[in-house]
Amino acid sequence: MKGKDDEGRRKKQEIYLMATIELTHLIEAGAHFGHLTRRWNPKMKPYIFMEKNGIHIIDLKKSLGLLNQAYQEMVEAVSQGGSILFVGTKKQAKGVIESEAKRCGMNWVSERWLGGMLTNFSTIRKSVKRLQNIEKQETDGTFEKITKKERLFLTRERDKLKKILEGVETMSKLPGAIFVVDIKKEDIAVKEAKRLNIPVFAMVDTNCAPDDISYVIPANDDAVKTIELIIKYMADAVIEGQAKFKERRAEEVADRERARKEHHEESEQSEEKKVSKKHLKRKDRKEDDISEEKKDSDHKEPSSES
């Protein structure tokens, strides 16, 4: 039994230590290269290490610390049952945004951010239902009953909606947080999240203002290798959070089952006590009856002798 417990603990540790990033990984990915110095945003000064050949170099020691902090915060958010929306529509990010969001079972936006995707969520859900309705018509025989022109119109509408909404088709409620690549390009997404008090995790380059970002990850947001490295790390954080969420749920179920059993045992013991009391009362009554009968008998015997 002890061996099984040790094995279970080892497996949990493997899950929780599955993702690590070191300074060398960030350097190899080119995460330290910022923008030209003339394009910098002064608000990023705390995260800049130096200037070299007209380019700002990001302080990767700070980046690593903030990246690990963001990782832990994302684990915590997901472990509480929260969901993450991954956002990255630039060419360098869209492929890995989609693949990593799928890997960790989260929603994503990799084509175009529709205005109101968060702040006007009910309208977005209507568009999703429209897409699902067209897809249903394709399979239920409706397409066979309409004209070729109508079919062409619906097919084009479906393709357009699918391209934009595919990543959020299963998003039935607002996300618990969003992860963004390039906050300058995705400024509408950031503004909508801020308006709704939704935490924002983001890769922030030297040409951006980090004011509206809850968890800043200073890094080169144009290099494919850097984007891939950080997004995969955040997806690992989601997976770790999901494992902790499942573990917590399992513990809650076990606690409820244990409480139910204890309550059942207490009820049985209480019932046994009641039965025992009834039995004792009956026994006492029987003894009283016997005693009374004996008294009556003793009282009658002398009179019969006289």
Q: Model-predicted segments: where are they?
A:
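Intrinsically disordered, compositionally biased charged tails
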Residues: 1-20, 240-306
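Ribosome large-subunit tunnel/peptidyl-transferase-proximal elements
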Residues: 16-249
